[in-house]
């Protein structure tokens, strides 16, 4: 029977299917749609498996979103945001706050060079059209 080979898309948008990536993916700790390997951070988004080297991640934080359906109580979902070069490159949605907290805790333990928490972006000055 046809066996599907694992392949991953990297931050440079290129596909890889190297044995080092596959072995790290198979041995990684799985939390929701995220896997934390020894070499790479793996996540799924729209059916595509992505890998990110840990040194590519400069900052990470949790963003809480609130939804108010009609005639129902509000519910919350949690977004794990990964940042590189002041740009958010991954926005991973979780239903459970504990999953995001566990991922952040494991990242803090294993990768102390990653910064944690939200930073307000610089406000750009508006151009004056008339003097």
Predicted regions and their residues:
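Phosphoinositide-binding peripheral membrane targeting modules
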Residues: 37-73
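Short acidic/polar mixed-charge low-complexity motifs
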Residues: 32, 48, 86-88
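Generic preference for well-ordered secondary structure
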Residues: 20, 25, 36, 41-44, ...
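His/acidic/aromatic-lined binding-pocket segments of jelly-roll/cupin-type domains
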Residues: 33-34, 51, 81
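Acidic, Ser/Thr- and proline-rich intrinsically disordered linker/docking segments
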Residues: 2-3, 59-131
């Amino acid at each position: 029977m046809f066996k599907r080979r694992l392949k991953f898309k990297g931050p440079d948008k290129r596909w890889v299917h190297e044995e080092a990536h596959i072995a790290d993916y198979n041995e990684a700790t799985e939390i929701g749609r995220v896997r934390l390997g020894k070499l790479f951070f793996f996540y799924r988004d729209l059916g595509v498996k992505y890998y990110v080297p840990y040194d590519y991640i400069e900052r990470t934080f949790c963003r809480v979103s609130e939804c108010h359906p009609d005639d129902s109580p509000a519910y919350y979902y949690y977004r794990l945001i990964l940042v590189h070069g002041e740009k958010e490159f991954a926005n991973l949605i979780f239903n459970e706050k504990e999953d995001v907290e566990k991922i952040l805790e494991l990242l803090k333990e294993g990768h102390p060079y990653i910064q944690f928490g939200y930073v307000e972006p610089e406000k750009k000055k508006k151009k004056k059209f008339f003097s």
